Amino acid sequence: MDNDIDATAGKHLRGKYAVVGVGETGYVRGTDCNTRTLATRAVRAAMEDAGLSNLEVDGMLSYSNNDSTTSPLVAGDLGIRLNFYMDVYGGGSSTEALIGIAMGVIEAGMCNTVAIFRAMNGYSQVRIGGTGGAGTRAPLSGGGLFGRAYGLMSAGQMFSQSFMRHMYDYGTTPEQVAMVKVIHSEHASNNPKAYYKQRVTVDDVLSSRMIVKPLHLLDCCVETDNGTAIIVTRIDRARDCRHTPAAIQSVVGRCSKPRADNHYQAGPISTVAGHYAKDILWPNAGVGPEDIDATGSYDAFTFTTMLQLEDYGFCKKGEGGDYVSSGVTRLGGERPNNTSGGHLCEGYTHGINMVIENVRQLRGDVDDSCPVGPDGKRQH
């Protein structure tokens, strides 16, 4: 017996569910709000965006690194009586994973409409990118035993090994990958919500101080305080909501290695989970990379965007440096990426603001940074 998934099975849920509401607080550095307040405000904003009352939401999901609030508290603040909730310890891909879980629990009849949130004081309190958080102190277990003894305490330190390996194997250069920051800064300059709106150059990136080779300061995301939320429901309910629903065509979860300590296990270390997930993702969605007009990537670092776009099949393995430096991902290019500025410029939300941005793109709500085709019309 194996664990292979039949990507063409009739059980897939293509087009049966949609994101109907999105909400967020400001992306700031320094707030007088705790994460409970941020989450409550974000979920309320998403409900208002969808045109839903507290009586019409009955499920709630969230993720954190033990740095946030819980669903029952937020639901209580909003007067929501929950039929289902779950709070998970998650990472950068948890938004998409929880979208899949929301679809599953609705399909199972456990609830009807699910709010998903991430709230974090990622600058003023728990800074994921630093080395002084609670997770860096003893006692350690699991993957932490492999890395912490050698000084691998931050995400940048751990990811840098993958980036260096890609440079070694394929000749990728920091100059090429710096274009990710350049392009995302161009997009953020159009976005009034972005924390960093200033455009930068490749020289700006490479002359910023070194954090851990090959990452310079401007290769790294912008730590911010924020709350963000989305709402998922069935497509038939979605049509009664305030905006055109953003239909969900496919959701896939896949780990690249059995354990989180990616660099201490067999197999390539410069390949991300998208390499393994794409053969399920695309058939389930009924489209391929060539059909996509705009993308959203988890840009915790410039290099992570490059690896994701490569491993999801937008270019061949080893050609990611050429792809991101070609201009294809900027507004006016063939396939704009992170049109709000992403984590590198709009603000770090642990993965959810790219989903919010793409929902707005699909609805045509983003006049200042919406991809525009040669004929002047929006293309989605």
Annotate each language-model stretch with its function.
Residues 31-32, 125-131, 189-193, 259-261, ...:
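Short acidic, glycine/serine/threonine-rich loops at helix termini
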Residues 13, 63-158, 196-222, 254-256, ...:
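Conserved catalytic cysteine-centered active-site region
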Residues 90-120, 156-190, 230-236, 345-366:
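Active-site-proximal alpha-helical scaffold in enzymes
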Residues 2-93, 101, 105, 162, ...:
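Conserved active-site "lid/cap" helical segment
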Residues 2-35, 179, 210-276, 280, ...:
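Condensing-enzyme catalytic core mediating Claisen C-C bond formation in acyl metabolism
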Residues 267-302, 311-314, 343-347:
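Extended C-terminal subregions enriched in glycine
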Residues 54-63, 84-87, 114-119, 175-183, ...:
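Beta-strand segments within the central parallel beta-sheet cores of soluble alpha/beta enzyme folds
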Residues 66-77, 260-265, 299-322:
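Short glycine/threonine-rich loop-to-helix capping motif typified by GTGT followed
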